[in-house]
Amino acid sequence: MFLNGTAMSGGADHHLVGDAPLVARTTTAPRYRFHAVEGRYPALEDLGAAAGAAIEGEVYDMTYAQLREVLLPGEPDGLELGVVELADGSGSLAMVLRTGHEAPRTDISALAGWRAYQEGSA
């Protein structure tokens, strides 16, 4: 599972990862727009073939039970489970911007990560 928000190491929701092992610190392929939705949470938007940004995150080996029972129930309504392309071309489950979600959001793609956004907002 590719995490790019508060569940990353050091984040407020990292406890939700439990004992799942960290597989890699990596980025997505450069095909995403990265948003701060209502200033509260990050969201990846796939631009497809259009040029986007590579977004920082962490990949964890989480069980489906962990996803179903612990991580996913706490996710905001503006996100849905999807698959993202990582820098090495492989795919990973991740939370992405829900199709049709219209909440106010700010494009933070140039920052390439949620931590950088939070540091700049503090």
Predicted regions, residues:
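Glycine-aromatic micro-motifs
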Residues: 1-122
